[in-house]
C-alpha cells in the first residue's frame, strides 16, 4: 500500500498537467502562508493598540527576527531540493540521510540564535534608537523569540519534509495550527486576559514561541504518520559532512539573501529614524500588510521548487518550462491585486494599526509609492526560486545583492538627502526595476545551462 501511494505521488509530480499540479501543490501552502500573514498582522495590530512605540520596537527587532527565520527557511530550501532530487532519482537511502541531517541542523541553528539573543539583543536594538521605551520593548521581544527559536526550526523543517514528498496539505495544517494558536494566545499575554499579567511586547514574544511549539509538534506528528517516503532512523541523524555541504551549497545563498534583506531593513530603519520614529512604524506596518500578498507568492514558490527539482532529476525539460510560465503568471496576478488595494485604499489598510494623524500622513503616500513595484517583484521572486531549484542559488544571491545593496539602500540614502521622508519610498520601485533586469539575465543563463546538461545526458 505504501509503495502504491509513493508511486502515485511520483507519477503526479512527473505526469500531471503542470498548471493543475502547481495549483494542487501550491494552493495549500499559499493558504497556510495567508494564515501566517494574518498572524503577522494580528500580532502587530494587538501590539499597536498598546502604543506606537511598541509597533516601532517590533519594526526594529524585525531584521534580527528575519535572520532567525531565514536561517531555517534557507536550510529548508537545501533540504527540500535535495529530497526532491533524491526521490526523483529513486534514491530513498540518500533521502533518509538528508532528512536525518536536517534535524541535526535544526539544533545547530537554534544554538546560534539563542547565543545571539542572550548576549547581543540589547546592543542590536540600541544601535537603531536611543529612545529608551522603544529600546526596552524591542530588547524583551527579541530576546524571547531567539531563545525560544528551537520550535520554529523544527516546525519549518517538518513542513519542508512534507512539502518535498507532495504532502502540501499536511504542511499547511501544521503551519496553520501554529499560527492560529499564536493568534489566539496573543491577547491573553499582551493585554493580560483571564488573570494573566499584561506583558505587551514580552507577551507577544511568549505567544509566538508557544504557537511555534504547537506547529512543530503538529509537523512531527504528520510526518511520522503520513510521510512514508522518508523514514528517519537515529543513524540518519549522524552529521554527514558531504550532505550538510550539499544542503548549504543550495540553501546558503538563500540564507545570505535573507541576511542581506535584514541588513537592508536595519539600514532603512536607521535612515527613517533620522526623520521620525513614526516613519519606522509605517515601514513596519507596510511589511505586515504586504505579507498578505507576498507570502502567498512565497507559498507558490514552495510548490514550484519541488516540481522543478523532481523533473530536473527526471530529465523532463518541457515540464520545467511550463511550470515556470504558470508560476510567473500566477505570481503576477496575486501581486497585481495587492497593487490595486494599496493604490485604492491605503488609509483603510493602515486603520488596522490604530494610526495617529501623523502616521496616516506619512503612511498613505508611502503605501501608494512602494506598491508600484509589486508586479515586477512577482517575476523576480519566481525567477529566483527557479534558479535555486536548478542548483544555481548563487544567481539568486547575486540578484538580491544587486537589488538591495547596489540599488535600494543607495537610492534610499540619496532620496533622504532631499529632506522629505515621502521621497525615500521611491527607492523600492527603482530597486525592483534593476532587480528585474538582473533576474532576467541570470535566469536565462540557468535555463541555458540546464538545457545543455539535459541534452548531454540524453546522448
Residue spans for each PLM region:
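Small-residue hotspots at the loop-to-helix junctions and early N-terminal turns
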Residues: 52-63, 138, 142, 205, ...
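Helix-terminus/linker motif at the lipid-water interface of multi-pass membrane proteins
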Residues: 34, 38-56, 125-132, 188-199, ...
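Transmembrane helical elements of multi-pass membrane transporters/channels
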Residues: 24-43, 144, 178, 211-215, ...
Amino acid at each position: 500500500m505504501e509503495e502504491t501511494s509513493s508511486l502515485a505521488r511520483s507519477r503526479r509530480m512527473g505526469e500531471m498537467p503542470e498548471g493543475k499540479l502547481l495549483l494542487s501543490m501550491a494552493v495549500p501552502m499559499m493558504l497556510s502562508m495567508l494564515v501566517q500573514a494574518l498572524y503577522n498582522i494580528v500580532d502587530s495590530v494587538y501590539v499597536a493598540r498598546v502604543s506606537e512605540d511598541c509597533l516601532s520596537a517590533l519594526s526594529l527587532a524585525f531584521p534580527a527576527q528575519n535572520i532567525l527565520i531565514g536561517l531555517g527557511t534557507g536550510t529548508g530550501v537545501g533540504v527540500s531540493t535535495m529530497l526532491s532530487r533524491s526521490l526523483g532519482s529513486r534514491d530513498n537511502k540518500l533521502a533518509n540521510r538528508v532528512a536525518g541531517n536536517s534535524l541535526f541542523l535544526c539544533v545547530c541553528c537554534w544554538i546560534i540564535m539563542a547565543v545571539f539573543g542572550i548576549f547581543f539583543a540589547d546592543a542590536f536594538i540600541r544601535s537603531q534608537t536611543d529612545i529608551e521605551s522603544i529600546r526596552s520593548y524591542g530588547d524583551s521581544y527579541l530576546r524571547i523569540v531567539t531563545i525560544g527559536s528551537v520550535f520554529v526550526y523544527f516546525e519549518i523543517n517538518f513542513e519542508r519534509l512534507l512539502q518535498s514528498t507532495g504532502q502540501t496539505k499536511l504542511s499547511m495544517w501544521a503551519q496553520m495550527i501554529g499560527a492560529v494558536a499564536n493568534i489566539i494566545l496573543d491577547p491573553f499575554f499582551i493585554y493580560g486576559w483571564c488573570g494573566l499579567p499584561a506583558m505587551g511586547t514580552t507577551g507577544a514574544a511568549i505567544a509566538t514561541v508557544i504557537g511555534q511549539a504547537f506547529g512543530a509538534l503538529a509537523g512531527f506528528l504528520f510526518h511520522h504518520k503520513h510521510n512514508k517516503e522518508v523514514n528517519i532512523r537515529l543513524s540518519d541523524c549522524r552529521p554527514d559532512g558531504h550532505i550538510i555541504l550539499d544542503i548549504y551549497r543550495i540553501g546558503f545563498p538563500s540564507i545570505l539573501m535573507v541576511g542581506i534583506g535584514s541588513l537592508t531593513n536595519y539600514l532603512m530603519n536607521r535612515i527613517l529614524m533620522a526623520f521620525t520614529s513614526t516613519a519606522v512604524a509605517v515601514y513596519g506596518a507596510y511589511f505586515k500588510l504586504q505579507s498578505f500578498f507576498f507570502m502567498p507568492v512565497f507559498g507558490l514558490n514552495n510548490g514550484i521548487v519541488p516540481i522543478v527539482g523532481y523533473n530536473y532529476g527526471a530529465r523532463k525539460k518541457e515540464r520545467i518550462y511550463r511550470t515556470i510560465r504558470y508560476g510567473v503568471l500566477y505570481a503576477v496576478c496575486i501581486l497585481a491585486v495587492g497593487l490595486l488595494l494599496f493604490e485604492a485604499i491605503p488609509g483603510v489598510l493602515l486603520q488596522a494599526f490604530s494610526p495617529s494623524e501623523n502616521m496616516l500622513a506619512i503612511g498613505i503616500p508611502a503605501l501608494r509609492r512602494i506598491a508600484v513595484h509589486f508586479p515586477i517583484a512577482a517575476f523576480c521572486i519566481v525567477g529566483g526560486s527557479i534558479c535555486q531549484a536548478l542548483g544555481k542559488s548563487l544567481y539568486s544571491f547575486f540578484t538580491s545583492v544587486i537589488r538591495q545593496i547596489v540599488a535600494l539602500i543607495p537610492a534610499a540614502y540619496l532620496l533622504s538627502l532631499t529632506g522629505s521622508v515621502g521621497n525615500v519610498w521611491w527607492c523600492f520601485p527603482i530597486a525592483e526595476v534593476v532587480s528585474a533586469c538582473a533576474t532576467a539575465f541570470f535566469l536565462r543563463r540557468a535555463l541555458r545551462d540546464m538545457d545543455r546538461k539535459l541534452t548531454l545526458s540524453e546522448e
